[in-house]
C-alpha cells in the first residue's frame, strides 16, 4: 500500500551524486478541507489508496525531485491528451510526472512523464507507490535510477523513433475492435499511440509535428491520434486573400 510505503521511507537517508546527505521529510497529512477541495475537482471518487496516503502526508518536504505532492500540483496543460491530468511531481524545468485520472477509476496508475523538450509522453511507473520507491532508490541524476533512465534516455528514444505508432490504414484493418473504431474516424495520414497496456520504454512524441501537432484522444481509452497541423498560407496567398 502507498500509505505504508510513505511511512517506511520517512526519515530515510538519501545521498546524492555529490555525496551530500539528507534525510527525507514528509509534509503533514491533508486536512479535511484539502480533501474536500480535491474531491470537488475530480471526475470521480477519490480512491481509497490515495485517501489513506493523504492521511499520512501530502508529499515530500524535501527530496530528490524539485517537488512531489499527492495534492495536484497543477500547472500541466495538454488537455487534449489528458482531460483530467493530476500532477504529482515536477523536475523544476517545466516537466511533470502525471496521472491520467479517468472518470469512475478506482486505480490511479500508471504514472507518466510529460516532457516538453523533447515533446514526449513516457511511461514511468505502474503506480504511485512504485514511483515513490523509484524516487528514493537512487538519486534522479544517477544512471541507475529509473527516473534518470526515462528522463535522459527514454524520452529521446521516443522522440527519434516512432516505430511503435500505428498507421491509420493498419489500425482500420486491426482485429482490435477499439483500435479499429478509432481509426475509422481519423484521416489517412494519422498515426496512433496505444498506451492501454504501457511497458517500460512506452510513450509517444506528442509534438512530433511541431508545437501545433494535432492530438486527438479516443474517449477515455489511452489511444491518441497525431496528425500534422493545417499548413499556414504563404505570404502571397495571404497578400491576395487566397
Please give the residue ranges for each predicted region.
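A surface-exposed partner-binding patch
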Residues: 1-106, 110, 160-242
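Compact, glycine/acidic-enriched structural inserts
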Residues: 109-146
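Charged, amphipathic alpha-helical linkers/stalks
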Residues: 152-153
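Charged, low-complexity intrinsically disordered regions
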Residues: 156-158
Amino acid at each position: 500500500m502507498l500509505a505504508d510505503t510513505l511511512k517506511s521511507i520517512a526519515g530515510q537517508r538519501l545521498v546524492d551524486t555529490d555525496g551530500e546527505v539528507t534525510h527525507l521529510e514528509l509534509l503533514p497529512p491533508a486536512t479535511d478541507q484539502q480533501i474536500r477541495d480535491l474531491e470537488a475537482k475530480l471526475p470521480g471518487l477519490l480512491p481509497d489508496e490515495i485517501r489513506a496516503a493523504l492521511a499520512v502526508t501530502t508529499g515530500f518536504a524535501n527530496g530528490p525531485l524539485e517537488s512531489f505532492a499527492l495534492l495536484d500540483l497543477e500547472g500541466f496543460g495538454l488537455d487534449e491528451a489528458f482531460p483530467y491530468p493530476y500532477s504529482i511531481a515536477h523536475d523544476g524545468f517545466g516537466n511533470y510526472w502525471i496521472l491520467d485520472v479517468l472518470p469512475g477509476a478506482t486505480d490511479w496508475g500508471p504514472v507518466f512523464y510529460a516532457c516538453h523538450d523533447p515533446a514526449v509522453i513516457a511511461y514511468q511507473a505502474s503506480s504511485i507507490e512504485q514511483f515513490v520507491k523509484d524516487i528514493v532508490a537512487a538519486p534522479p541524476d544517477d544512471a541507475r535510477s529509473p527516473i534518470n533512465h526515462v528522463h535522459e534516455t527514454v524520452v529521446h528514444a521516443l522522440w527519434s523513433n516512432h516505430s511503435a505508432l500505428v498507421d491509420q490504414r493498419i489500425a482500420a484493418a486491426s482485429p482490435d475492435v477499439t483500435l479499429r473504431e478509432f481509426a475509422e474516424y481519423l484521416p489517412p495520414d494519422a498515426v496512433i499511440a496505444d498506451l492501454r497496456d504501457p511497458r517500460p520504454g512506452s510513450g509517444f512524441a506528442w509534438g512530433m509535428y511541431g508545437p501545433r501537432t494535432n492530438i486527438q484522444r479516443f474517449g477515455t481509452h489511452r489511444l491518441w491520434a497525431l496528425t500534422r497541423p493545417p499548413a499556414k498560407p504563404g505570404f502571397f496567398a495571404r497578400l491576395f486573400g487566397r
